[in-house]
């Protein structure tokens, strides 16, 4: 889901200047700052384009995703989970002194769910609010979350403090991680437009940071991955779990976690030759089609990647982005891919959100490796996007997925 017409963003907005000041609590009343920024809420969503539901309460729960067999659920080729996460401090690296701690997810549970349909805009989406409804029901019905501990930001709500403006999203992120403790389980789910912007601190091999777009992005700008990491990952103590789910374009490393895993359960390493070949092919195709600008853009990207290969030290980046907390991010696609705003079983939905819920509904006892592979398998029948799984620490991909 990417609204821009070029490779990067809507307009080159600078990233936020660090995380916002501390907030004493999420429910502190409406915040009207976006009105001063010139954002004007639509009068209401267009009728009949999504499953409208004005209140998210226990008495009016979203409908669950459809049940039924898919044929993908045989996880024998990846193996069943070896067991729950190990307890205690985990060390890794020779003489590095780095330790982390898995969460058993037995503590407090909180969730922040953000869905942006961008009503009335040229790049309107149809499935993002449905994704939030499905995810909230899924967390309550299957994972022990309580409605009172779930904050929902969507652009169809009457309470202006619950509209997904940039300021409201950042404040809600701060609420999510406030007073986090070991064995807590936190969930951040975003469904909306995503994109990229030029990397300014040298931590991206590609030269681009991932971003998400609030409903008021044209006035307030986007939210960059460096800042999402600073707000939601850095404050977490060892043994606290954060599960981040990104159903958006260019979201492969949207939380800036240092360990990205392949479908074989091993850490991916940057592949300059593969990236260079892709850029060269794109340049050739653009030239053949008479798109000189596109050819120049692809060649420029290739030159930047080659130049940055010597200046970006992966070990240093991993040290800077490492966290002793238990942070997992599952995204809908690679950094250079788009994520589908789709329709499944007659309902508008994000393809990634739909596959995550469907796979776990039909096969709850899965390893991280089988979850990643099953999501890819179910999407491969219709979509080209490839979900990604990244972690704040070296991850045993064969233990049971929990959240």
From Swiss-Prot:
Name of the protein in question: Metacaspase-1
GO MF terms held by the record: calcium-dependent cysteine-type endopeptidase activity
Residue stretches of biased makeup (Pro residues): 13-22
Classification via InterPro entries: Caspase-like_dom_sf (IPR029030), Metacaspase (IPR050452), Pept_C14_caspase (IPR011600)
Protein purpose: Involved in cell death (apoptosis).
Family: Belongs to the peptidase C14B family.
UniProt keyword Mitochondrion, yes or no: no
Gene3D superfamilies hit by this protein: 3.40.50.12660
Record organism: Scheffersomyces stipitis (strain ATCC 58785 / CBS 6054 / NBRC 10063 / NRRL Y-11545) (Yeast)
Disordered as annotated region, ranges: 1-95
